[in-house]
Amino acid sequence: QAGIATVLKLHSKGDEAGQWFTDVDVSYRYDYVRDRSDSLINRKDIIDFSEIASLVDFGNNEWSNNIFKISTIASRRAPGLTTAYWVTTGNNIKFPSLQQQISQITFLDPNQQRLMPERMKSLEIGVNILTEPKEMDNIDQLELQASVFRNDYINKMRSTFLLGMPIAYFENVTLATMSGLELKAKAKTYGGKFSGEIGLSNYNISDMSAFPFKSAFKLTINTTSRWSIFTFGARLYQEGEQTGLILVPEKGFNEIELPAFSNYDLHITVDINLGFGEGQISYTGRNLKKNNISLDGLLLRDTRKYLTLSFEL
């Protein structure tokens, strides 16, 4: 694999008032990939690639691609208020690794298609507002961020797993699209003693199976509070339904649907200072709400608890 990359950055000096600033970044990358399966050194007691060469077109590839990306951000800075707008667009490519290509020899199907590079075109538009409201007591900082995006894929690489085995199988989905809206709001209050963040994601996905176990909706709430030697943190989240595929030998693909769920995490830290040294005692609990959803007998969101002690002299 070889390639070349270059980046051009343009920065404006701002307007006469020194409030508006504009940055433009342009990047270009050329990639060249060449794979040769006949140069592999394989152990014939495990598998002999020469015996399956007539069944599977594997590992002999010569790919190249040009990648362009451009992003621009315009920001306005004023006392107590900063606003930024950005637009990013471009294309990208993901070449199949040899390991991903090897997965296709799991089933010697002469009709299966060779694994092709994944190509993507993307567009994102967003805004960020950061303010320090003087008129609101005990509110140190407020931040709001919103963005919309669209990703178009050609030959989207999808991974599935063999039932009961941690073996990934890769294939291409000819066309796939994902677009959506992402919102995030943050607040710092009482001199940084309490902070909170809420995030909302809503996606429009053309084919849920092309994005295995990807939720089309997600809501998260994070809070952190500090008092004396104690730090308390909590994370609450809710996700929508998820869809994935399981590969069953001699039967093909089975679609798996996981229901929507919600759960929460807790984190507590106590600072220790004994004069001759200092440290922390921390407790972390993840997925504390009981959830019995399992896949092939394996709990997917099992409860986990950690107790950690650190001390430094």
Regions found by a protein language model. Name each.
Residues 1-81:
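Signature of Gram-negative outer-membrane beta-barrel scaffolds
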Residues 20-26, 68-70, 83-87, 140-146, ...:
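Transmembrane beta-strands of outer-membrane beta-barrel proteins
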Residues 4-12, 70-76, 125-129, 181-187, ...:
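Residues on the lipid-exposed face of transmembrane beta-strands in outer-membrane beta-barrel proteins
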Residues 10-22, 75-83, 132-142, 190-193, ...:
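Short loop/turn motifs that connect adjacent beta-strands in outer-membrane beta-barrel proteins
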Residues 93-94, 155, 230, 238-247, ...:
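C-terminal beta-signal and adjacent terminal beta-strands/loops
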Residues 77-79, 84-96, 100, 117-179, ...:
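Membrane-embedded beta-barrel scaffold of Gram-negative outer-membrane proteins
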Residues 1-2, 20, 62-68, 119-123, ...:
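Residues that define the transmembrane beta-barrel architecture of outer-membrane proteins
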Residues 31, 137-157, 167-247, 289:
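Gram-negative outer-membrane beta-barrel transporters
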